Swiss-Prot record:
Pathway: Lipid metabolism; butanoate metabolism. Keywords: Fatty acid metabolism, Lipid metabolism, Lyase. Belongs to the enoyl-CoA hydratase/isomerase family. On the 2D-gel the determined pI of this unknown protein is 5.2, its MW is 30.9 kDa. This is Short-chain-enoyl-CoA hydratase. Its EC number is 4.2.1.150. It catalyses: a short-chain (3S)-3-hydroxyacyl-CoA = a short-chain (2E)-enoyl-CoA + H2O. The keyword Hydrolase does not apply. The lineage of its organism: Bacteria, Bacillati, Bacillota, Clostridia, Eubacteriales. GO terms for molecular function: lyase activity. It comes from the Bacteria. Signal peptide: none annotated. The gene is crt.
């Protein structure tokens, strides 16, 4: 869990910040 509107909040957030997005 950590996907919030395309924002991955957590440790990988720094690596992935646009999942729901293009």
């Amino acid at each position: 869990m950590g996907f919030n509107g395309g924002i991955l909040e957590g440790e990988e957030x720094k690596a992935v910040v646009t999942i729901n997005x293009p």
